[in-house]
Structures are given as C-alpha cells and as structure tokens.
Amino acid sequence: MKEAVKTVKPKVPAKKRIVTGSKTKKKVFVKKKPPAKKPPDKKPLKKTTKKTVKKVINRPKSIHIPNKDLKIFKWIPTPKKEFTEIETNSWYEHRKFENPNKSPIQTYNKIVPVVPPESIKQQNLANKRKKTNRPIVFISSEKIRIYPTKEQQKILQTWFRLFACMYNSSIDYINSKKVVLESGRINVAATRKVCNKISVRKALKTIRDNLIKSTNPSIMTHIMDEAIGLACSNYKTCLTNYIEGQIKKFDIKPWSISKRRKIIVIEPGYFKGNSFCPTVFPKMKSSKPLIMIDKTVTLQYDSDTRKYILFVPRVTPKYSVNKEKNSCGIDPGLRDFLTVYSENETQSICPIEIVVNTTKNEYKKIDKINEIIKTKPNLNSKRKKKLNRGLRKYHRRVTNKMKDMHYKVSHELVNTFDKICIGKLNVKSILSKANTVLKSALKRKLATLSFYRFTQRLTHMGYKYGTEVVNVNEYLTTKTCSNCGKIKDLGASKIYECESCGMYADRDENAAKNILKVGLKPWYKQK
C-alpha cells in the first residue's frame, strides 16, 4: 500500500476580510515594485558672484610717540597770546607767534625742481616708445592770452567745431569695434588693434578729408590728426581706470559742439613769426611773445569769459637753493583755514569769519538766482541761459579768491619749511547728504575752502621748490595730548587741557603738533 505524500503549501501573507453585508471578500496584499526614480531636473547654474569683503583697518589704540624720540621740544604756546600779522597783499589774514626760546636753524643746499614720480613714469614710457634717451625734466604749463580779430575769431570757432566733430567720429569708430563687451569684460586683442591712432587715422581718412574741404580757409590736417590721437589716449585712460576699479561703469561720452570750453591741439611746427598758422593768421596779438615753442600746445576758448588762452609747456631748468631744516604740521579746520605748528613758531591762516565776509555778496546773488530758477520754471531759453551765465560768473569769483589764497599760502609755506605734514581731511563724507550733524551753512563754508585743491597745489609747489609734502591721517590727532599721550574727548571746547601732565593749549595747535609727530615717524608710509 502506497504511502500518502504530504504536500507542503507555500506560506501566504496574512488575509484581510472586508465584510460587505452577508458576503465576504478576501483581499491579499501583493508586494509592489518601487516606482522608478525620476532624474532630478537640471537647474540653471548660478553665476558665481564675488562676495564683497570689507577691509578691516587695524588702527592703533594710540598714536603718541615721545618728544625725545623725534628730537622735538615740549614747547606749545598757550591759547592767550598776541599774534604778529604778516603782509599778504590779499584779502585773507596770516598771523604768526614766535617761540621766545627760538633755536638756530641749519641750512643746506638742494637742487630744485624735483620731478614728480608720475611725470618720470610717463617720460620713461615716451622714451621707450620713441627709442630715445631724452633727459627727464620738470614740465610746467605757461598761460599766454591771445587777442584775435573778429574775422580770426570766426575762423577759430569753425576750427573748434571741426576738432570736436573729428574727436566724436573717432570715438564712435572705436565703440563700434566692441572693445568693452556687454558682460563687462574687455576684449584685449581688440584694444591693441583699435586704440592705435595710426589704424584709426587710416580708417577715418575719408571723413577727415571731407571735414577739411568743408571750410575755407581749411583747417590743417595735423590738427585733425591730433583730435584722433586725443580720442585714442582718452579711451585708453578710461579703460585703465575701469580695469583698476576707479570707475564703476565704462562710459566715454562725445563732446557737445556747444560746450563751454572748447579746445584745439596745435603742433610746434605751426608757430612762426610770433603767430601760429601764419598762412591763415599772419598777425596775432598776444600777452607774451610766442617764441621757443618746441612741444604741442593747446588753445582753449571759454564762452563765459570769452578768452582765448594758449597752454604752452615749458621746461624749468634745475638750480640749487639754500633750504632750512625746518618741518611743520598743518591742521585744516573750520575755525581757521590752516593751523601751522613748528618748533619755532605757530601760524593761523585765514579765520573762517573773513571767508564768510568776503564771499557774502556773491552767495547772496547766487541764492537769488537759484530762487528765480526754482519759482519760475516756465522761463524762456534766453532768460535761462542768462541766469545760468550769472551763476557761473559769481561761482567763478569765489573760486578765483580761493585760488589766490591757495597759491600765495602754499608759496610762503614751501619757502619756509623743507618738510610739511598736512592732515588728510575727508571732505566727501562730511559734505554727503547722509551727514545730518553739520548744517548746510557749514557745508557751504567747507566747499568754498576746497581743502583737496589746496593739497594738490601745495604738493605741486613742493616739487617745484624742493619741499616734501606728506599726507597724514587725522585719526586721534585732536584727542591725544601731544606731551604725554593721554586720550581725551574734547567735544566742542576750543582748548585742550590735559589732566595728567597739565598741558594747556589750543586744540588746533595740539592737533597740528600731533600731525607733525606722526609725519616724522620713520615707519610711517604715505597712504
């Protein structure tokens, strides 16, 4: 008898009953395959943006350095003192107080003028380009005014217009070659080809010839070539400023034909017989004789003043001068334009009250004209032009007064001192709209004094007469005691009274002494 074979049933997952009335249904759970994973959507790559990192300036807690280390006297005058006035032959005041225990000053010979480093760089590049070994010289421009007749003025005005047209057409040609791309990058290969005045001259030959033929008497071809060269050089400088980050957006604008100041550039070969371009202008009256001109000259016309001025570059020969070993510190401010401190004397130059009184009438007229322009917007074009010309006239009067003071003061300082340490005043942040602490009247005073222009003129005069000018940061110069180094918040007080050493002095003179000490530090670098 055969044995029964046991059949083993496979295991089935648990059953679930769903009751629907009387009937029952069995539902079996079956394992489902997991759904196929979809590939992730490709997102557009984000452009990597450079994070702007703020520069952390590690400023020292104290700027004090002992007087012994710099071999400076402790002397500083008290606030109550009698000044002696210096003759200025101008509208401003210049007062001086001498040290009673004055020490003798040593003298030495120095060869002047000193060529500035930027000028040395440019002259070396010119020597490399022209393959010459010309000596490096100090170049300064001389102003010569010319007095053309009415017929000569008409010819010159057409020449100014043609020069501007040639300049604009050459800039349009360079822009068409797409030197700067839309992304902001610079096409270096295109710049080498395009920003070359010879290649631009060849491309714009027909335009140049048509412009020359359009006038009678015709303008010289070399003057038109100078316009092309000027456009190329301006384009290059704009590119370098954009690369170095000095300007945020690259934008070189064409000249408007009706602009205030118009120029033409004239080669030295056209100057003959006390005139230029003798075939067109056989006789030309001038304030100085037009002789010994060996460099390119620019002729400028100002429509407001109606003056024709030639800017002639001249080489100043070197000579030796006896200089005194005497250094000073200068604190620019709002009470006095400049406060000067040296071991033998202190000076206060031009109190702010005198500046207000001298520019009072000009600013009254400026405010009156501005009110007329604001209250009456529907003025005629002729009336508007007249008012704007009046505004420029009174602004020019103020700038001329400041210019006179700047040059006379800088000339006197440069001749008395061999090293000048001047405080670097950040006028831009003070005059900004964000600064609500200062009133508009104070901001106007600061703008009229124009400290930045004064430092520029002082440095130029320093190179000319062999005086070193150092710009010093004014950080903690007013708060620090120049004798012991204690820091104190002064607020609005005009006098610095130290509690630790008992020094009693004017706050501006104390700051000027600190500026001098910081400038004389051996490790200090000009920033």
UniProtKB/Swiss-Prot annotation:
What Pfam family is a match for this entry?
A: Cas12f1-like_TNB
Question: What name does this protein carry?
Answer: TnpB-like protein R854
Q: What does the entry give for GO biological process? A: DNA recombination; transposition
Q: Does the keyword tRNA processing apply?
A: no
Query: Which keywords belong to this entry?
Result: DNA recombination, DNA-binding, Metal-binding, Transposition, Zinc
Record the organism: Acanthamoeba polyphaga mimivirus (APMV)
Q: Does the keyword Transport apply?
A: no
A GO MF annotation of the entry reads: metal ion binding
Compositional bias, Basic residues, is annotated for 21-36
